[in-house]
Amino acid sequence: MAIHLYKTSTPSTRNGAVDSQVKSNPRNNLIYGQHHCGKGRNARGIITAGHRGGGHKRLYRKIDFRRNEKDISGRIVTIEYDPNRNAYICLIHYGDGEKRYILHPRGAIIGDTIVSGTEVPISMGNALPLSATDMPLGTAIHNIEITLGKGGQLARAAGAVAKLIAKEGKSATLRLPSGEVRLISKNCSATVGQVGNVGVNQKSLGRAGSKCWLGKRPVVRGVVMNPVDHPHGGGEGRSPIGRKKPTTPWGYPALGRRSRKRNKYSDSLILRRRK
């Protein structure tokens, strides 16, 4: 979708660049309410994810990540905004009467036909297993399963795309959007194409209120805090952090420290770490 610029009448509109308007009129049987409790707190009330709170109320859209309507063609009826993700979603009407939401593939328009199965053509929006003979090396894919039948878990954000680079034995080698190269079972399925709304990183909200509507709180630098609140805090005026390297509010090394847990079962499946 295109980026929309407003006429420069106020500072907020002068600096803003938002998506072109995509209406959302979700179906009642495909949505349900969700209770946002905690706002970044754990069960003890301690902040575990900072800068979260407030925001507009949302209704969750049930997205079909499994794509288990096999060999039944469906038609894209609407392209809608989803407040729970950066990507847009499509409402699909299948031939058997089923109606489901899927992630909007880049370039898909209203009226296009999609299908999922083991022997379906390699066209945008179709879902098929990585072992399919029709899926050649170099295919751009998204919504990739890690566990068979669990549904897509990889490459689901706006503009995300992975590439199939090899097939050998029972595994397929993928290059993920992060740059990581890893093995996936060839029986797992994926959707052909790239997730839509590629220009989401060109958006500029223009004002603090727009970010507040998204449930994002202000971010405060540690160097302007008091020593009781952050290791970088304290000093007179604009003072340095007083350490050789920057740290987190809890004193751990920041900016580049690897946070992945050791000895995970998937370590043997990762051929090259993310960038």
From Swiss-Prot:
Example GO biological process: mitochondrial translation
Keywords associated with the record: Chloroplast, Plastid, Ribonucleoprotein, Ribosomal protein
Primary location recorded for the protein, binned into one broad class: plastid
Gene Ontology MF terms in the entry: rRNA binding; structural constituent of ribosome; transferase activity
SMART domains in the record: Ribosomal_L2, Ribosomal_L2_C
Region named Disordered: 1-22, 226-275
Protein family: Belongs to the universal ribosomal protein uL2 family.
Record text on subunit structure and interactions: Part of the 50S ribosomal subunit.
Family annotation (NCBIfam families): rplB_bact
Protein name, per record: Large ribosomal subunit protein uL2cz
